[in-house]
A protein has these predicted regions:
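Bacterial N-terminal signal peptides that target proteins for export
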Residues: 1-10
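Short beta-strand edge/turn micro-motifs at domain boundaries
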Residues: 27, 137-168
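Short, low-complexity N-terminal intrinsically disordered segments enriched in polar/charged residues
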Residues: 22-59, 171-182, 190-195, 199-203
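Short, well-ordered alpha-helical segments enriched in acidic and aromatic residues
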Residues: 51-69, 76
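Surface-exposed, charged secondary-structure patches
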Residues: 26-27, 37, 70, 79-132
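A mature extracytoplasmic/lumenal domain signature
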Residues: 61, 71, 121-124, 140, ...
């Protein structure tokens, strides 16, 4: 009797779980249209970066938006954001010829009324003017606000692992090369001094 009761209870739990899952699957996403707009913004930002088109990027941002760049520098407002980008990417005294990325969304955006938050990862490639190109993985997070019926970026944060990245690996490699070079130079110097001392003794 107890075994039969247990089976009935298990069956009821399974049926209830199936019913809840079915209802959840049939419930329409209240933010479906918002998600489409946010993905369009995401695409425009990514394409703007890869085309070196700061105007295309800024068009997705509120006029008072803040961007925290990979070097931890902050830009506030369209003019400041454009000035930073042109100082870093381009020609003349710029640091980079170009900057490209392949971005991914980590999870669906979270909504709090007319505010949406999302985050993800980026596979970046930098082409400096004065050195070889290098790649680095980074992370991004964004806060968007629905203003006058349209979604705009109000805060964009870019970050990278400062303790483990390709630039640090390169520095470590250079340290090893320098150490090996110093050791070799020391051995050569000791060999030369040894020969000189032996020559003096022979005299």
């Amino acid at each position: 009797m107890r075994q039969q009761t247990y089976r009935v209870m298990v069956l009821l739990v399974v049926l209830m779980g199936w019913s809840v899952a079915t209802i959840a699957a049939d419930t329409p996403d209240a933010h479906a249209e918002d998600r489409k707009q946010l993905l369009q913004i995401f695409s425009e930002i990514e394409n703007g970066i890869n085309e070196q088109n700061i105007e295309r990027m800024v068009a997705q941002m509120d006029e008072n938006a803040t961007v925290i760049w990979l070097n931890a520098e902050a830009s506030r407002g369209h003019a400041d954001i454009k000035a930073y980008y042109k100082r870093m990417v381009g020609t003349g005294d710029a640091i980079l010829k170009k900057y490209m990325t392949k971005a991914k969304v980590a999870a669906p955006a979270r909504f709090m009324g007319d505010i949406a938050v999302a985050d993800g990862t980026m596979e970046d490639e930098f082409v400096p003017i004065k050195r070889d190109a290098f790649k680095m993985n980074s992370n991004w997070s964004v806060t968007c606000a629905k203003l006058n019926g349209k979604w705009k970026i109000v805060h964009l944060h870019l970050s990278a692992n400062v303790f483990n990245n390709s630039l640090l690996d390169e520095v470590k490699q250079m340290v090893w090369y320098a150490a090996a070079g110093g050791l070799l130079a020391g051995l050569v110097l000791m060999f030369g001094i040894g020969r000189l001392m032996r020559g003096k003794r022979a005299d």
